[in-house]
């Protein structure tokens, strides 16, 4: 097991067969060495105990229950006085059951097997190192063809062929007998080679330094030749030079790391610890197993068949042995990377088996899901939606998420207020969702910030603090102005919420991480909280209003007579629907908003709003469009966007401006923001 205090880094590379056996082998008191998995079985169907020498064997991987062997005997773990440490009957070691998370086994392969990652992946390291085409190596690995390897100073079939021709008549009966005997297999195996064993021999023969020097010399020769004038030939030379560079880098890497290239061909296949490929019992006596177990069983079945062919049956044709070696190679390929050679292996339900590569690679793989990023307590995750009514430093948490995040705080509040006598009663009240639970939750949330994070966290603004409030629904509500820091939008993005527990974390969240305190980009200093496209569209809709102008209402086509002057008519193409009603008058913005909420007017309906006396309007030299006189002597001067009511003595009594409810809303929000800014500045000084 890796000690996290002693080991600060992890390196993945090729391992020797001796190291694989050292990981797995254990020596029993009787001198027996265990560690090799020889049987494809998992659990016995009657006793429901692991099969001996199987994929879940307790002798190889350790006991299922701490300190209890397969016989049922118990020993105290860690007690040096307890002797022996192994059960004399079953051979199981008396250790903690957590050993099954890291104790490995191995399968001794009857024939060498090429590691498919180094053969089929791009680039192919085996093909680059041997300087041979990938298709040729594949045909060799999967026994589609063989290559000659005559040995010096020994008779070969090619050398003896001449003597056979002269003595063909005298030996015409003995030669066929020779080809059917076991001696011919030895004779042939010395001359030809196929399978992964041939690859292993080629990887073990050459000197890496010679490969580096030879590749460097060829690269220099190609560089001295210069361009040939033929575009196709120049491209071919360029590709060859690039290949030579990759080959030299690969050879130097093997030299630097002191790794033998023949390790890319496996003789021992490691078996993962059982806890990493579990079998889970479910209701009805059924079980769910990891796909890797089935792939391991497939390898063991085929490997045992090959062992039987090589040991028990001496008269087995060589072609049958080669076919079985190919099946073993394909089984190991499927275990390591299912589907890398084409059609993936499927189960009875037409579901693709998850191989070792599928388990470790990708976003949901072992590294990114478990090692690099782990799930933590006091956290949740949900889709984000816009919260237009929220303040910049607030976020909306769904009730379902909030009650889970702050459950321990709510339980403490229920017990302190004597609403619940113990934790069990408090949890039952939370499950029943009593009203007192939500009241206590509101009190807890008022003094506790939360952290929102959106992956990937590329800079410090990727995680910010907010003051949570309860909202309905199942989505997290977020102010649109903080989206730029998270690089988020509302098209289905998800964000994680975390609860800072310690006082130091809460202080850091309040003083440094609150969203309203991170308004500028830490990189370039530009404003980070700027209106997004959604906000700009909303502001446009809010303030667009009715753009027909004052004249369009007076010269209404629906109410025109013979005195209509079409030259003075102001009509926009997008406003084709008019009414005969006059624009309403309101004494205050509250009356106008109340009328809108009562649905008496629309958001963009034009209206007259009484306004304070504005010197800019009074001093304006604009000529009124028309003047309305009343019976008491007062009169109204009507302009394009405002109206002035004057007395008989030409004193200004009041002013009305022509606006919409949308403009009123927008103006009030701007006014509140400005007043809040000045109030904050006055507090600061």
Swiss-Prot record:
Instruction: Write the protein's name.
Output: DNA-directed RNA polymerase subunit beta'
Tell me the GO BP annotations in alphabetical order. Answer: DNA-templated transcription
Where does this protein hold Mg(2+)?
489, 491, 493
The protein's matches in InterPro entries, at most eight in alphabetical order, are given as: DNA-dir_RpoC_beta_prime, RNA_pol_asu, RNA_pol_N, RNA_pol_Rpb1_1, RNA_pol_Rpb1_3_sf, RNA_pol_Rpb1_clamp_domain, RNApol_RpoC1
Specify the enzyme's EC class, one word: transferase
Q: How is the cofactor bound?
A: Binds 1 Mg(2+) ion per subunit. Binds 1 Zn(2+) ion per subunit.
> Binding positions for Zn(2+)?
69, 71, 87, 90
Under the subunit heading, UniProt states: In plastids the minimal PEP RNA polymerase catalytic core is composed of four subunits: alpha, beta, beta', and beta''. When a (nuclear-encoded) sigma factor is associated with the core the holoenzyme is formed, which can initiate transcription.
Q: Which cofactor does it need?
A: Mg(2+); Zn(2+)
| Keyword Cell division (UniProt) | no
Q: Report which reactions are catalysed by this protein.
A: RNA(n) + a ribonucleoside 5'-triphosphate = RNA(n+1) + diphosphate
Key words, A-Z = Chloroplast, DNA-directed RNA polymerase, Magnesium, Metal-binding, Nucleotidyltransferase, Plastid, Transcription, Transferase, Zinc
EC number of this enzyme: 2.7.7.6
List, in alphabetical order, the Gene Ontology terms for molecular function in this entry: DNA binding; DNA-directed RNA polymerase activity; magnesium ion binding; zinc ion binding
Originating species: Buxus microphylla (Littleleaf boxwood)
Which residues span the membrane?
none
Q: Which family does it belong to?
A: Belongs to the RNA polymerase beta' chain family. RpoC1 subfamily.
Location(s), subcellular: Plastid, Chloroplast
Q: What does this protein do?
A: DNA-dependent RNA polymerase catalyzes the transcription of DNA into RNA using the four ribonucleoside triphosphates as substrates.
UniProt-listed SMART domains = RPOLA_N
């Amino acid at each position: 097991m890796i000690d996290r205090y002693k080991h600060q880094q992890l390196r993945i590379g090729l391992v020797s067969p001796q190291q694989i056996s050292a990981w797995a082998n254990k020596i029993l008191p009787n001198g027996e060495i265990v560690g090799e998995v020889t049987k494809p079985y998992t659990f016995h169907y009657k006793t429901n105990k692991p099969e001996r020498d199987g994929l879940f064997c307790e002798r190889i991987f350790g006991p299922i229950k701490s300190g209890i062997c397969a016989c049922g005997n118990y020993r105290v773990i860690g007690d040096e006085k307890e002797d022996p440490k192994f059960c004399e009957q079953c051979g199981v070691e008396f250790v903690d059951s957590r050993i099954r998370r890291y104790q490995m086994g191995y399968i001794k392969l009857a024939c060498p097997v090429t590691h498919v990652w180094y053969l089929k992946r791009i680039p192919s390291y085996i093909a680059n190192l041997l300087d041979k085409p990938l298709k040729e190596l594949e045909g060799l690995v999967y026994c589609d063809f063989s290559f000659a390897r005559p040995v010096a100073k020994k008779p070969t079939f090619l050398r003896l062929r001449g003597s056979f021709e002269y003595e063909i008549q005298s030996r015409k009966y003995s030669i066929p007998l020779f080809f059917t005997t076991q001696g011919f297999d030895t004779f042939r195996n010395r001359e030809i080679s196929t399978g992964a064993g041939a690859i292993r021999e080629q990887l073990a023969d050459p000197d890496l330094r010679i490969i580096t020097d030879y590749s460097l010399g060829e690269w220099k020769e190609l560089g001295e030749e210069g361009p040939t004038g033929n575009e196709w030939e120049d491209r071919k030379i360029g590709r060859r030079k690039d290949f030579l560079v990759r080959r030299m880098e690969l050879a130097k890497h093997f030299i630097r790391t002191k790794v033998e290239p023949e390790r890319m061909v496996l003789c021992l296949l490691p078996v993962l610890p059982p806890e990493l490929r579990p079998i889970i019992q479910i209701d009805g006596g059924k079980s769910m197993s990891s796909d890797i177990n089935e792939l391991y069983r497939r390898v063991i079945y085929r490997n045992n068949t090959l062992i039987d062919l090589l040991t028990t049956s001496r008269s087995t044709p060589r072609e049958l042995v080669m076919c079985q070696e190919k099946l073993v190679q394909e089984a190991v390929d499927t275990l390591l990377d299912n589907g890398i050679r084409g059609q993936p292996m499927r189960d009875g339900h037409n579901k693709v088996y998850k191989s070792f590569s599928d388990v470790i690679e990708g976003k949901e793989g072992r590294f990114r899901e478990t090692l690099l990023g782990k799930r933590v307590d006091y956290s949740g995750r949900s889709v984000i939606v816009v919260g237009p009514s929220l303040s910049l430093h607030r976020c909306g948490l769904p009730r379902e998420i909030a009650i889970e995040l702050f459950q321990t705080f709510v339980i403490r509040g229920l017990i302190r207020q004597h609403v619940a006598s113990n934790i069990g009663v408090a949890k039952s009240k939370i499950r029943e969702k009593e009203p007192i639970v939500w009241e206590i939750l509101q009190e807890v949330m008022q003094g506790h910030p939360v952290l929102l994070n959106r992956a990937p966290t590329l800079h410090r603004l990727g995680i910010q603090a907010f003051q949570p409030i309860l909202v309905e629904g199942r989505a997290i509500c977020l102010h649109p102005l903080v989206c730029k820091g998270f690089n988020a939008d509302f098209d289905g993005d998800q964000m994680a919420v975390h609860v800072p527990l310690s006082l130091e974390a809460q202080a850091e969240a309040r003083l440094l991480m609150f969203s309203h305190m991170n308004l500028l980009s830490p990189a370039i200093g530009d404003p980070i909280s700027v209106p997004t496209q959604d906000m700009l569209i909303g502001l446009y809709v809010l303030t667009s209003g009715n753009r027909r102008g004052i004249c369009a209402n007076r010269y209404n086509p629906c109410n025109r007579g013979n005195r209509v002057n079409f030259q003075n008519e102001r009509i926009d193409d997008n406003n084709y629907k008019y009414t005969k009603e006059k624009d309403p008058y309101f004494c205050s913005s509250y009356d106008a908003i109340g009328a809108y909420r009562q649905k008496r007017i629309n958001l963009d309906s034009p209206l007259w709003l009484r306004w304070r006396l504005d010197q800019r309007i009074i001093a304006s030299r604009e000529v009124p469009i028309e003047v309305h006189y009343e019976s008491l002597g007062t009169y109204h001067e009507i302009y394009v966007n405002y109206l002035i009511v004057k007395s008989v003595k030409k004193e200004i009594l009041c002013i009305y401006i022509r606006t919409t409810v949308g403009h009123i809303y927008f103006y009030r929000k701007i006014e509140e923001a400005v007043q809040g800014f000045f109030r904050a500045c006055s507090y600061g000084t």
